[in-house]
Amino acid sequence: MAVSKFIQIRRDLHKIPEIGFKEWKTQQYILDYIGTLSNEHVEVKVWETGVIVKVNGKNPEKIIGYRADIDGLPITEETGYEFASIHEGMMHACGHDVHTTIGLGLLTAAVTERIDDDLVFLFQPAEEGPGGALPMLESEELKEWKPNIILGLHIAPEYPVGTIATKEGLLFANTSELYVDLKGKGGHAAYPHTANDMIVAASHLVTQLQSVISRNVNPLDSAVITIGKITGGTVQNIIAEKSRLEGTIRTLSVESMSRVKSRIEAIIAGIEASFQCEAVIDYGAMYHQVYNHEALTREFMQFVSEQTDMKVITCTEAMTGEDFGYMLQEIPGFMFWLGVNSEYGLHHAKLKPDEEAIEKAIVFLDQYVKWKGTRK
């Protein structure tokens, strides 16, 4: 059975996942598709490996923005798709192929039937890291086209197709990467008293970090410290001179993030003293919380509930990280979850979003944009 135009686009994009600021094929695919629209009212700019598109309205008084992240993840795909990734060790495991396809569908609808206001589409690289939203927002390319209102979405495997979920105010957490390098003194396994073992130091650090959440964060607040990777040592009979911990910090408040980092630094200083080692801390990429504009979100939820076929759910905050939060710091707007009904979750090698969600999203977002684009 033949698949629809936009499902085919999603499958094409799914084949070519690329990591942050290396999305060259994805960028070219987007540009090639936009070229097929060939409309005098469409303007295109390239920024890094992203694309910014403006559709000029008939009688513009504001600019409405839609942001789609376009990068993939360093994950080996296990979906069994015929259209699985052709890039070894990389996969669209967070739905950015779906986000981009919906953006192209919404762009197509906007070109086909122009609204009063201008529309700007931000096909943004590097959401998974090192972060593309903030530099794109600050770029010269976007300066003239900066939206007055902006919206974004993220697929949600746990919600059924035909459903969206969002809330006013805080939606996603503040996030920060965490990298700690420990350096001590290596030695022979038979003479531990002559060395400073960085495997043991790393083990103590991991267990002590967990006390930050239970003893330094308000129980009515939420925070997470996860160490996802530890490396160290060379062979079984040599005491490790170095070790490295890699993890993530997530909090629902800016104040908690500051407190958690302060406690991490104090604990690491204690590890340095206890194990006579040196430690270097790097917080890597840090994403601001996603905080939805209350009035716009409330208006959007009411519109979708009353004037479209989609079901609206009021959800709770999530510890998810999203650099779209930087855009919402400067531009009123909102983000929402789009139900895609997948057995496997985000960042899983077997994530399989239900493709029926794509055209449903294009249809109801087109309805919303046309409605919003004629309101003062």
Curated annotation (Swiss-Prot):
Gene Ontology biological process terms in this record: diaminopimelate biosynthetic process; lysine biosynthetic process via diaminopimelate
Pathway assigned in UniProt: Amino-acid biosynthesis; L-lysine biosynthesis via DAP pathway; LL-2,6-diaminopimelate from (S)-tetrahydrodipicolinate (acetylase route): step 3/3
Active site: 69, 128 (proton acceptor)
Protein name: N-acetyldiaminopimelate deacetylase
Entry function: Catalyzes the conversion of N-acetyl-diaminopimelate to diaminopimelate and acetate.
EC number: 3.5.1.47
Matches recorded under InterPro entries: AcetylDAP_deacetylase (IPR023905), Amidohydrolase (IPR017439), Bact_exopeptidase_dim_dom (IPR036264), Peptidase_M20 (IPR002933), Peptidase_M20_dimer (IPR011650)
Residues in coiled coil: none
Major enzyme class: hydrolase
NCBIfam families: amidohydrolases (TIGR01891)
Catalytic activity: N-acetyl-(2S,6S)-2,6-diaminopimelate + H2O = (2S,6S)-2,6-diaminopimelate + acetate
Family affiliation: Belongs to the peptidase M20A family. N-acetyldiaminopimelate deacetylase subfamily.
GO molecular function: N-acetyldiaminopimelate deacetylase activity
CDD domains per the UniProt record, alphabetical: M20_Acy1_YkuR-like
The entry's keywords: Amino-acid biosynthesis, Diaminopimelate biosynthesis, Hydrolase, Lysine biosynthesis
